[in-house]
A protein has these predicted regions:
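Residue-level signature of the transmembrane alpha-helical core
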Residues: 9-13, 17, 96, 124-129, ...
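Short acidic/glycine- and proline-prone juxtamembrane loop motifs at membrane-interface regions
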Residues: 25, 164, 169-171
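Hydrophobic transmembrane alpha-helices and immediately adjacent juxtamembrane helices
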Residues: 61-67, 87, 124, 130
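Start-transfer (signal-anchor) and selected internal transmembrane alpha helices
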Residues: 1-55
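Short hydrophobic/aromatic helix or loop-helix immediately within or flanking a transmembrane segment
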Residues: 65-115
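A structural signal for well-ordered alpha-helical segments within the folded catalytic domains
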Residues: 15, 72, 91-95, 99, ...
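Catalytic phosphate/metal-binding cores of nucleic-acid and nucleotide-processing enzymes, i.e., regions
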Residues: 17, 102-106, 142
Length: 171
Protein backbone atom coordinates (compact mmCIF):
# COMPACT_ATOMS: atom_id res chain seq x y z
CA UNK A 1 0.00 0.00 0.00
CA UNK A 2 1.43 3.37 -0.92
CA UNK A 3 1.91 5.82 1.97
CA UNK A 4 -0.90 8.21 0.91
CA UNK A 5 -3.28 5.27 0.48
CA UNK A 6 -2.40 3.94 3.94
CA UNK A 7 -2.99 7.43 5.33
CA UNK A 8 -6.42 7.53 3.68
CA UNK A 9 -7.32 4.14 5.18
CA UNK A 10 -6.25 5.36 8.64
CA UNK A 11 -8.11 8.63 8.16
CA UNK A 12 -11.28 6.85 7.03
CA UNK A 13 -11.09 4.52 10.03
CA UNK A 14 -10.62 7.44 12.42
CA UNK A 15 -13.52 9.31 10.81
CA UNK A 16 -15.80 6.29 11.32
CA UNK A 17 -14.79 6.05 14.99
CA UNK A 18 -15.48 9.76 15.39
CA UNK A 19 -18.88 9.45 13.69
CA UNK A 20 -19.77 6.48 15.91
CA UNK A 21 -18.76 8.39 19.05
CA UNK A 22 -20.76 11.45 18.00
CA UNK A 23 -23.78 9.28 17.14
CA UNK A 24 -23.69 7.57 20.52
CA UNK A 25 -23.28 10.91 22.29
CA UNK A 26 -26.24 12.34 20.41
CA UNK A 27 -28.29 9.25 21.34
CA UNK A 28 -27.48 9.85 25.01
CA UNK A 29 -28.19 13.57 24.97
CA UNK A 30 -31.22 13.86 22.70
CA UNK A 31 -34.41 11.95 22.09
CA UNK A 32 -34.28 10.29 18.65
CA UNK A 33 -36.23 11.95 15.86
CA UNK A 34 -36.99 8.67 14.12
CA UNK A 35 -38.83 6.29 16.43
CA UNK A 36 -39.09 3.41 13.95
CA UNK A 37 -36.44 1.43 15.83
CA UNK A 38 -38.85 0.84 18.70
CA UNK A 39 -41.33 -0.89 16.38
CA UNK A 40 -40.43 -4.55 16.55
CA UNK A 41 -43.33 -6.89 15.94
CA UNK A 42 -42.54 -10.60 15.99
CA UNK A 43 -41.73 -12.35 12.72
CA UNK A 44 -44.70 -13.78 10.83
CA UNK A 45 -42.98 -17.14 10.68
CA UNK A 46 -40.85 -18.41 13.50
CA UNK A 47 -37.27 -17.18 13.04
CA UNK A 48 -34.59 -19.82 12.70
CA UNK A 49 -32.39 -18.05 15.26
CA UNK A 50 -33.39 -16.90 18.76
CA UNK A 51 -34.48 -13.26 18.66
CA UNK A 52 -33.71 -12.10 22.20
CA UNK A 53 -32.16 -13.43 25.37
CA UNK A 54 -34.28 -14.14 28.40
CA UNK A 55 -32.97 -11.06 30.18
CA UNK A 56 -33.11 -8.39 27.47
CA UNK A 57 -30.81 -5.68 28.83
CA UNK A 58 -30.56 -1.97 28.14
CA UNK A 59 -27.36 -2.42 26.13
CA UNK A 60 -29.16 -4.68 23.67
CA UNK A 61 -32.04 -2.21 23.46
CA UNK A 62 -29.64 0.68 22.83
CA UNK A 63 -27.84 -1.25 20.10
CA UNK A 64 -31.11 -2.30 18.49
CA UNK A 65 -32.29 1.31 18.50
CA UNK A 66 -29.40 2.23 16.19
CA UNK A 67 -31.31 0.63 13.32
CA UNK A 68 -33.38 3.51 11.99
CA UNK A 69 -34.93 4.49 8.67
CA UNK A 70 -34.05 1.83 6.10
CA UNK A 71 -31.94 -0.03 8.65
CA UNK A 72 -35.14 -1.24 10.28
CA UNK A 73 -36.15 -2.91 7.01
CA UNK A 74 -32.68 -4.37 6.38
CA UNK A 75 -32.44 -5.85 9.87
CA UNK A 76 -36.00 -7.20 9.68
CA UNK A 77 -35.26 -8.83 6.31
CA UNK A 78 -32.11 -10.37 7.80
CA UNK A 79 -34.02 -11.63 10.83
CA UNK A 80 -37.38 -12.68 9.37
CA UNK A 81 -36.85 -12.89 5.62
CA UNK A 82 -38.93 -11.03 3.05
CA UNK A 83 -42.36 -11.04 4.67
CA UNK A 84 -44.08 -8.11 3.01
CA UNK A 85 -44.17 -6.78 -0.52
CA UNK A 86 -42.51 -3.49 0.47
CA UNK A 87 -39.52 -5.35 1.90
CA UNK A 88 -38.52 -6.43 -1.62
CA UNK A 89 -37.25 -2.87 -2.17
CA UNK A 90 -34.30 -3.76 0.08
CA UNK A 91 -32.07 -6.03 -1.96
CA UNK A 92 -30.75 -9.17 -0.30
CA UNK A 93 -26.96 -8.70 -0.25
CA UNK A 94 -26.79 -6.59 2.90
CA UNK A 95 -29.40 -8.60 4.88
CA UNK A 96 -27.81 -11.89 3.82
CA UNK A 97 -24.34 -10.60 4.76
CA UNK A 98 -25.65 -9.37 8.11
CA UNK A 99 -27.27 -12.73 8.82
CA UNK A 100 -24.12 -14.63 7.81
CA UNK A 101 -21.86 -12.46 9.96
CA UNK A 102 -24.18 -12.63 12.98
CA UNK A 103 -24.54 -16.42 12.70
CA UNK A 104 -20.81 -17.06 12.37
CA UNK A 105 -18.36 -14.49 13.71
CA UNK A 106 -20.73 -12.79 16.16
CA UNK A 107 -22.75 -15.87 17.16
CA UNK A 108 -21.25 -15.89 20.69
CA UNK A 109 -22.84 -12.46 21.28
CA UNK A 110 -26.39 -13.66 20.52
CA UNK A 111 -27.06 -15.21 23.97
CA UNK A 112 -25.87 -11.99 25.60
CA UNK A 113 -27.42 -9.31 23.37
CA UNK A 114 -30.07 -11.06 21.31
CA UNK A 115 -30.16 -11.74 17.60
CA UNK A 116 -31.56 -8.36 16.54
CA UNK A 117 -28.81 -6.40 18.34
CA UNK A 118 -26.15 -8.65 16.83
CA UNK A 119 -27.69 -8.09 13.39
CA UNK A 120 -27.45 -4.33 13.92
CA UNK A 121 -23.80 -4.64 15.00
CA UNK A 122 -23.09 -6.76 11.92
CA UNK A 123 -24.72 -4.19 9.66
CA UNK A 124 -22.74 -1.34 11.17
CA UNK A 125 -19.47 -3.23 10.82
CA UNK A 126 -20.21 -4.17 7.22
CA UNK A 127 -21.10 -0.59 6.29
CA UNK A 128 -18.03 0.85 8.01
CA UNK A 129 -15.69 -1.63 6.34
CA UNK A 130 -17.33 -0.79 3.01
CA UNK A 131 -16.82 2.93 3.73
CA UNK A 132 -13.10 2.49 4.40
CA UNK A 133 -12.76 0.49 1.18
CA UNK A 134 -14.74 3.16 -0.70
CA UNK A 135 -12.44 5.89 0.62
CA UNK A 136 -9.38 3.96 -0.56
CA UNK A 137 -10.85 3.36 -4.00
CA UNK A 138 -12.05 6.97 -4.18
CA UNK A 139 -8.47 8.10 -3.57
CA UNK A 140 -7.08 5.76 -6.22
CA UNK A 141 -9.70 6.85 -8.75
CA UNK A 142 -9.07 10.51 -7.94
CA UNK A 143 -5.33 10.06 -8.56
CA UNK A 144 -6.08 8.51 -11.96
CA UNK A 145 -8.55 11.18 -12.99
CA UNK A 146 -6.99 14.29 -11.46
CA UNK A 147 -3.35 13.28 -12.05
CA UNK A 148 -2.55 15.04 -8.77
CA UNK A 149 -2.08 13.04 -5.57
CA UNK A 150 -2.41 16.17 -3.40
CA UNK A 151 -5.80 17.04 -4.84
CA UNK A 152 -6.85 13.39 -4.58
CA UNK A 153 -5.83 13.35 -0.92
CA UNK A 154 -7.80 16.53 -0.17
CA UNK A 155 -10.84 15.13 -1.99
CA UNK A 156 -10.60 11.94 0.06
CA UNK A 157 -10.38 13.91 3.30
CA UNK A 158 -13.53 15.79 2.29
CA UNK A 159 -15.19 12.47 1.47
CA UNK A 160 -14.36 11.15 4.95
CA UNK A 161 -15.47 14.23 6.86
CA UNK A 162 -18.44 15.56 4.91
CA UNK A 163 -21.62 16.23 6.88
CA UNK A 164 -23.54 13.44 5.16
CA UNK A 165 -20.97 10.79 6.04
CA UNK A 166 -23.04 9.69 9.02
CA UNK A 167 -25.31 7.99 6.50
CA UNK A 168 -22.38 6.02 5.11
CA UNK A 169 -21.81 4.38 8.49
CA UNK A 170 -25.31 3.81 9.74
CA UNK A 171 -27.31 0.72 9.06
Amino acid sequence: MTPPLAAIVRLATVSRALILALSLLARLLFRPYDTSASLHPPCLSSPSFPSAPSSYNSTAAAISSLAVWDGVHFSRSAECGYEYEQSFAFLPLLPASMALLSRTLFAPLVPVLGYRAVLVISGHILNNVAFVAAAAYFYRLSVLILKDSGAAYRASVLFCFNPASVFYSSL
